[in-house]
Amino acid sequence: MLDCGKKAVKSQVISGRLEKFVRLDSMDSRYSQTSDTGLNRCTLNLQGPTRGGGAQGNNVSSGSFKKGFRKGSKGLWSIGRSIGLGVSRAVFPEDLKVSEKKIFDPQDKFLLLCNKLFVTSCILAVSVDPLFLYLPFVKDNEKCIGIDRKLAIIATTLRTVIDAFYLFHMALRFRTAFVAPSSRVFGRGELVIDPAQIAKRYLQQYFIIDFLSVLPLPQIVVWRFLYISKGASVLATKRALRSIILVQYIPRFIRLYPLSSELKRTAGVFAETAWAGAAYYLLLYMLASHIVGAIWYLLALERYNGCWTKVCSNSSLDCHRNFLFCGNEKMDGYAAWTTIKDSVLQLNCPVNTTDNPPFDFGIYLRALSSGIVSSKSFVSKYFFCLWWGLQNLSTLGQGLETSTYPGEVIFSIALAIAGLLLFALLIGNMQTYLQSLTIRLEEMRVKRRDSEQWMHHRMLPPELRERVRRYDQYKWLETRGVDEENLVQNLPKDLRRDIKRHLCLALVRRVPLFENMDERLLDAICERLKPCLYTESSYLVREGDPVNEMLFIIRGRLESVTTDGGRSGFFNRSLLKEGDFCGEELLTWALDPKSGSNLPSSTRTAKALTEVEAFALIADELKFVASQFRRLHSRQVQHTFRFYSQQWRTWAAIFIQAAWRRYVKKKKLEQLRKEEEEGEGSVTSIRATFLASKFAANALRKVHKNRIEAKSTIELVKYQKPSEPDFSADDTS
């Protein structure tokens, strides 16, 4: 009768258990099926067994019935798909985006924004609810307690708007996936997208709390007072609002904490900045002051009403309790009560008498004597009560002088305990958030103190101490205590490459050696560069020391000096600026495929004339780049390297000087030979003798001078030509 095909299920053994997985129809076409096929495989078979002699009339009469039944079966099939039948119950977060189900990822940006707005709405709801406690007030001219209609309408409207957003959040919870607890073995886990399971989980956890929080009971009470009782049921309205607001506060506060925890779990942090976190806890403290002030106002009015009720019940006059509430002017005996109420209530319940008053109002006397319970100015009433709550929460109620009334004493005890807990919570969390702003500075101070103690213990000379202090100060100003290299190394490779490219590419292109290289080679170089800082008068490298890194100057000026290994009489000095580099001996070593592990020696001494920022490429990294990228072996790089290398520039200058001196010597010898040839043609003996003596003197002087120049030329030629890098590969680009 029921002909349903089996669903395609994939089984796999995981942790010794046979797990079943069902794919979404929209994810893989191999498991998808058309609507007609689905209807044929999962519909009621009304044809029955086929008989050869079936009558045609029976087929015609049952055709309409079968057609209607198929339509109904098709409708049931669509309903089954809409409620989640035949859809996988757990998927990964990235698969949820392509799913046909309208289910939200708990870490979706839209949902995170809604959660933050919902936390804000909860705080606003907790702030709006105390406004209902300000509705009752005392009418001095009529000596009765009434309800502020204007404030009631405003509070009801605000509460309704906030509850509407609360209802939207509740509806959103039925469409929010959750991570299956069994899938949290590794990674983020799988998301459960089955609407039935999502609804079941929400109903078992926070639905009851949310439902009790969103019940519009205060709105109903106020609406009943304004439009049904016509303002005649002040006592019932006051009692109902007091009970409802205080009772609904419990689920609202209970819901606020897990919602904040859930926001931290999904977003990673609750507040993006330290100031936002500190402001959040300060706001909660002010909110507590607002609640305490509203409760104090209501209890003060209740205490005042208690005094009136006591006078009314003890009076020999005809006094009914309802006479104390406005709206009961039509009751029997009210006219007689109006003639004596002022004198009776003022005599037995004075609020301005300090010497032996007939009724002790205790901590509520200030509210009654200030006149806020009878004021219709909500702004002055609200801020006065807010200040009272903030003052007594901060002082833990130390200035309160209570009466013997038990309710008043209990309220004072609760106020002191709440003030102690909230003040500790505020100070602790604000200290935590604000310390995070200066934690780097404190770490720097501790390191500087340890450095000073160490230098004092090791008895370092003053000049070394000053250099250490200058370096620490310069490094702090440049990095603010952040270990940039370690921070970048902890990121994924592609993200690390993009960050290095953003930070270093423009600076590396300013180095002429790398100006015309391709992008892949520049990416490889940028990924391996490390920032370096040097203070004034510090040595980057000394002549004769092994060169373990090649430095590319980004900012600052350096002095590069060479003495050709300490040879007397030889000194060469040049300046390095932004875009230059030093340690070029390492490039020759890296390009040589036969170079061993011994690092080359530096031919120059580099000293910082100002604060210097540079990028360093260590020997192993340069060797790797040179071996992987043949672009470094091009002729263009060869010419650029020779042009900007200080070692090659020095050799070229010395070579040119030696060649020029050889040329000058040759010209002088040629001139001397011509003079000798001209002198041989003279026949006068006196003139010949004179010329012979002059020639002998000049010859001696020339020989002596030539010897000195030849020796100087030999000394210049002694400066060896720098090693030629292996530029065997031609530039093919």
Swiss-Prot record:
A Gene Ontology cellular component where this protein is annotated is:
plasma membrane
Q: Where is this region: Calmodulin-binding?
A: 629-644
Transmembrane stretches, start-end: 118-138, 152-172, 208-228, 240-260, 281-301, 407-427
Which branch of life, at top level? Answer: Eukaryota
Domain IQ per the UniProt entry, residue ranges: 649-678
Extracellular compartment spans: 139-151, 229-239, 302-406
Any Pfam family the entry gives: cNMP_binding
Cell membrane is among the record's keywords: yes
GO function terms (MF aspect): calcium channel activity; calmodulin binding; cAMP binding; cGMP binding; voltage-gated potassium channel activity
Q: Is Cell membrane given among the entry's keywords?
A: yes
**Alphabetized SUPFAM superfamilies for the sequence:** cAMP-binding domain-like, Voltage-gated potassium channels
Residues involved in a nucleoside 3',5'-cyclic phosphate binding? 513-637
Q: Which compartments does it reside in?
A: Cell membrane
Print the keywords alphabetically: Calmodulin-binding, cAMP, cAMP-binding, Cell membrane, cGMP, cGMP-binding, Ion channel, Ion transport, Ligand-gated ion channel, Membrane, Nucleotide-binding, Transmembrane, Transmembrane helix, Transport
Record topological domains on the Cytoplasmic side: 1-117, 173-207, 261-280, 428-733
Topological relation to the membrane, as annotated: Multi-pass membrane protein
- State the oligomer form and interacting partners: Homotetramer or heterotetramer.
The record comments on the domains as follows:
The binding of calmodulin to the C-terminus might interfere with cyclic nucleotide binding and thus channel activation.
| Family indicated by similarity | Belongs to the cyclic nucleotide-gated cation channel (TC 1.A.1.5) family.
Its function, per the record, reads:
Putative cyclic nucleotide-gated ion channel.
Q: What is this protein called?
A: Putative cyclic nucleotide-gated ion channel 9
Species source reads: Arabidopsis thaliana (Mouse-ear cress)
